[in-house]
Amino acid sequence: MNNITRDIYTKGQPADLKRLLMKRNSFRRPLLNMRCNSVLQYSLEKRKLTVQDLKDTRMELNNMIRILTEAMAAHEWTVDNVNIADIQSLQSTIHSTLKNFQKINVLQLNINASDNSLAYLSKPEESYNFLTIYFSTLLSYEKVENLIKKSLTVIDSLYGLLNYQINAQHSLGCIPLNQDSFKQLKLLICILEEDIKLDDCGLEISASKNEYLEKIKTHYKTWLRIHTFLTLFPVPSVLSSNLKKQMYGWFEDLRDESLKSIILASLSE
C-alpha cells in the first residue's frame, strides 16, 4: 500500500487506529505470499476428495468396525482357556487393522468437507446430504479408534492373565511343603491382589483375574492345612486312615488333577 492510499484509508481515524492499520497492512502481503508458496498447502490441494471418496472411506471404516468386533467376539475368554495362540491371533488382527486405519488422512477429510460445504451453500439439499455423509464418516472413525484402544487394553490384560497362570501353576506344582514356600505363595497372592486393585480396564478380564486369584487362595489354604498336618505328623505313612480320609476330602473340589495327585502322593509316602 503506497503513501497516498494509506493516507486516504486512514484519513480521519484516531492516531492509535492509524498505527494499528499500518501495522496490520505491513504484514498482509508477506502472509499471502507464504500461504501461496506453502508446500503443505499445495500437497493438500493437489487432489481433493470427492463425495464418492468420502463414501468409500466410510465403508472402509465400517468394515474395520466389523473386523474388530468379530475378532473380539470370536473367543470367550475365561480362566481355563486363555492361550498364547488365541492372543497372538487377536493381536495380529488388531495390528493389520491399525495399519489400514493410520492411512486415513483426517486432515484431508476436513479440508474436503470445508470445500464442499462452501460449494453446496447455494444447494441446501445437496449440502445436507454431504454433511450427513461427512459426520457419519467421522463417527465411524471415532468408533474404530475406540475399538482399537479397547482391543489393545484387552490384549495387555490377557497377556497379564496368562503370565499369572504360568507363574502360579509353576509355583503350585513345584513348591515343596515347607515354611519358605508358603511365604512365597502368600507373596504371590498379595501381588495379584494389588494388581487387580490397579486394573481399570472394566472388562471380563478383571473377573477372570479375580476368579483365578480365588483359585490360588484355595490352593494356598489347602497347602497350609497339609503343611500343618505334616508338621504334627512328620511321617505321613503313620497317619490314621480316618485322618487321611479327612485330608483327602479337602481335594474333592480341586479341579487341578495334577496338583491333587502331587499332594496325595506326598501324603502317601
UniProtKB/Swiss-Prot annotation:
Q: What keywords is this UniProt entry annotated with? A: Meiosis, Mitochondrion
Any one GO BP annotation for this protein: meiotic cell cycle
Mitochondrion listed as a keyword: yes
Q: Which GO terms describe its cellular component?
A: mitochondrion
Where is the protein found, in the record's own terms?
Mitochondrion
Function description: Has a role in meiosis.
* Name this protein carries in UniProt: Meiotically up-regulated gene 43 protein
| Gene name as annotated | mug43
